Every structure is written in C-alpha cells, then in structure tokens.
Amino acid sequence: MLSSVLFPAMRTLLLLKYVFSLISLSAICCQTVSAIPVVSREGLPMTLSDKCAEALISDVACDPNVLDFKPGYYYSPEILQRACTDTCKSALDSYLDRVKSSCGTETIVGPFDLEVSALIVPGMRKDLFQKTCLQDNGRYCNNVAATAAVIADPGVSRFNYLSSVPPGTVPPDPCDIQHVCLYVDDQSMRNIWATIDYYSYWVLYIINAGCYNMHRLNGTELCISAPGQKFVPGDATDLPGATVTTPVPAPSDAASGSNRYCGRWYGVKKGDYCNLIVLKFGITMDNFIFLNPALNSNCTNLYAEESYCVLPVGDINTYSGKPGYVSTPTGSETTATGIRFEDLPDATENPYPRPPPGPPIAEGTRDDCNYYFDGAEFQYNVTNTYWNSNCQIPPPQVYRVDPESFESWNAGLGNISRPECSFKPGFRYCGRYYALSDDSDEPTPTTPITTSDDPTSTSATPTTPTTSSKPSPGAPTMTGQPSACNKWHTVTNGESCTVIPKTFGITLEQFLAWNPTVKSDCTENFWAGYAYCVGVKTLGPS
C-alpha cells in the first residue's frame, strides 16, 4: 500500500525538480552580466580625495554574487559557473589598477578600527574571487571542499535519513522527536500521511534556511535535540585550587607590589598577556590588578619572567581595600586595669592661654593654610623695583613658593602681576599652604629691592635664609636629581611611587620633577634600594 502511493509521488516530485533545474540552468546561461559597483559612496570616509573615491565606487563587470563571496562559505555549482568568469577576473584586475593609480597612499578605516591602505578594498575582493573560484581539472575546489565537509560531519544533510526502521528497533543515538503535521491540499500527500507508520523516519528533503519547504516534510519525524546521551556537567573543575585558606610562599621572582597574602603564583612567560592569564585562572581582570597593584589599569606593563598573584586566600572581598574588609585585632585580649573615666576627679588646672584668632581671612583665600600673614605686613612703595605690585613680593622672597600656587591659594587677588593688586590691611592671606622641612627658616617679611637712587622709594636688602648641611642620600641615586635636595627616601620592596608623595606631603608631579629618570607610570627606573628626592629646600615643599 505504501509503495503504491509513495513511489509515484516521489517520481512526480523528482521529475518536477529536474524540469525546474533545466529551466534555471537555461536562464543562467542566457543571462548577461551587468556592471556593478563594489562599494557605495556613502560607505567611504570624507577624507578621501575625489579622484580616489571615484575609483573605489567605479563599476566592475561581474555577477552580483561576487560581492557576496565570504571566506569559508560554500556555493552551488550554478552560482560558481555564473560568477567565476574570465570577464570578471579581468574586471577585478583593472579595478585594482585604477584604485592603485588614483589613491596612492591614501588610507581608510579597516577592520578593528585600524588605518589601512585604500587598496584593501580591491585587494580583498580579488583575493576572495581567486580562492572561491579556484579549479582543479575542471572542478571547483569550493564544491569539493563542501562535499568533503558533509561526508566528514554530515550534520543536517540529505544523507541523514532512513527510509524505514524495523518495529521494536531503538536508534543507537535517541533524541527528542517532533512529528511534522501540516495541512496540505494535495490529495496524494494526504494519502502518504495516512499510510506512513509512526516509526518511519522518511525525510526526503532537509529544511532550508527559510523553512519554506516544511510542506515537503509532512508526515515525517524530525530530531529536535542533540542526539545521543545528554551532557551532565560534573562537580569537579579544572581550575586548580578554586579556594584556598592559607597563603603560599612568594617566589623569588615575585613582581614588585604584588600582594604577598596570595594563594597561588604564576610565572609569566614570553607571549603571555593579561586576558590570557585571567581566563586561564578564572579570575576577573579587576581582581587580578587588585592583587598586583603595580599593573596599570590597562594591564600593559606585564613583565615576563616575573610571578604574579592569581588567586586570593579565601574571599577576596575580605582583603584591605575591598568592601568586606574588617580589621581584626591580634593577640590575646587583656583586662583593663586602673580607674574608670567616670571615677576620675574633675580638672582643676586653669587652661593655658590661647592666642587670639587673628584677623579674618581675606575673601577667596584658603581656610586650611599652614601659614598666614596679615595684609598690613606688605604695604610698600614698589616704584622703581623689580615688582609691579606688593602681591608679587611674598611668594618668592618670603615663602619660597611659585606665583601660580600663591594665586591659587589666594584666588581673591587674581593676577598678582597687575599693578593694582594689593593686600588689605587687617585681613589674612595664605602665604604657604604646606609646611617646609624642619631645617627651614620661618618666613620673614622683606622689603623690596630698589633699582634706582630715588630717595623717596623704600629699599632694603632681602633677608637671606640661613643654610645648613644637606643630608646624605644614604643609598645609590639616579641621575638628574636636584643638587638642592634636602630630603631623601630609600625605596623598599613593595613600595609604590604613587604612595611615597602622599607620605611626604608632596604631589606626584613634584616627585617626578625631582626624579626625572622615573617614568610617569613608575614602570622604569623606580628601583628598590635606591634613594629618591622627596624635598627641595629652595624649590618647593618637602
């Protein structure tokens, strides 16, 4: 019964398919190829010259399928016969020559936002054409490769079906089955549907990309899950030591600054990079940089032949600097002895005399300066002197600071080089925001130096601060450090050059200016055991 209905229907379908194939081939053979543009003007950058742009958007005498060629894709013999012509090959060669002569060294933005030559457009198109249209003894290699891929791994191919399976037979690789049931008008298809046994696995056609041939699968059963045994992930992980409770000793080549409270170290080899390491050890980039603070935010200063921490001890959120950190006291608890605060007698000593608060702070002046002065101290006649106004006298002569810093601390003065700039008597101004070293002199107001014999002008000789012997660095130093340096610091293992300036009350810019051999990100010439300048008596804070 099945064969009497099935095989006539199959012969009818195959005959129709053969007729339509002949019609399609005749249409392909008779169709002419028109010229097509390789790229559109809208896709080109505005920086290209008109001559180069015209060359890139010029037409080539190729089939439109040529523009759809992609590496690793397979195409039907009909498409290749239509697209792979000598005319198209010559057109692509001419297109390359036109772009080469018109564009010269002009560039466009290529893959990964890289700047590349404009020749990449015709070059890539010609390369894809040659690889896709490659032939051997009259056969397209693209078709041979497609057949080999199907045989090696059929997947959902037309060879993956059985006409029938004996009753009671269990497929070796069972899968979830979906019975296809579609309403069709063709009486013969309904007859086939009525006679097919439930266990039949007749699939004459595969599903195409748009599912437009589902009606041909009426009455069949399709596998809708991966065949075979379902994958069940195990409990074990291939990441060694996912959680450790005790730190391991740091190796001798441990990177400077890396956290020594570490559960695992990894020695970086040539060719390694940060993304590879974090994937290998299952750690996030943020945590990897947190455990190795010498690495910059982009992780571009990873050094080979050094070991880095790749696993925290316990929960990384309990580390100092993380939200879960709790400072735990060490040692045994002791019982407090002595008198309770509540039982202490009331104080009877008279408080020491406190100095008066002084004049009010001038408008725009900082309220947290280390040293203030009264505006009445600088009321001089600066005619025929080096200065345009009294505001220029305190910074270099008394407080040894640069004018820019002085202006920022006293924003209400504005530009201190203006002749109309002056201090208001009875108001305090910031003379120095920071404290100088212990051996520095206390600032003393100085009258300006006269430059003429005008008896009406006030003149005086500025006070010269006393000097003291400069301290010895106490360790090897770098070149370029100032001779006036009066404070040194010897770097120890694990120290960061971003922390040292904060320790000594200076800025990172000052530290780098006094130690010019140190790179701005402290990755070069910042060595343990070397002394670095952290204070200059005559140039700034220490």
UniProtKB/Swiss-Prot annotation:
Carbohydrate attachment residues: 218, 298, 381, 415
UniProt domain LysM: residue ranges: 264-310, 487-534
Keywords tagged on the record: Chitin-binding, Glycoprotein, Repeat, Secreted, Signal, Virulence
CDD domains cross-referenced by the UniProt entry: LysM (cd00118)
Disordered: region residues: 439-484
Tagged with keyword Signal: yes
PROSITE patterns: LYSM
Chief site of localization: secreted
Biased composition (Low complexity): 443-472
GO molecular function: chitin binding
InterPro entries on file: LysM1-like, LysM_dom, LysM_dom_sf
SMART domains: LysM (SM00257)
PANTHER family xref list: AM15, PEPTIDOGLYCAN-BINDING LYSIN DOMAIN
Function: Might have a role in sequestration of chitin oligosaccharides (breakdown products of fungal cell walls that are released during invasion and act as triggers of host immunity) to dampen host defense.
Comment, domains: The LysM domains bind chitin and potentially related carbohydrates, and might be involved in damping host defense.
Protein name in the entry: LysM domain-containing protein ARB_00327
Source organism of the structure: Arthroderma benhamiae (strain ATCC MYA-4681 / CBS 112371)
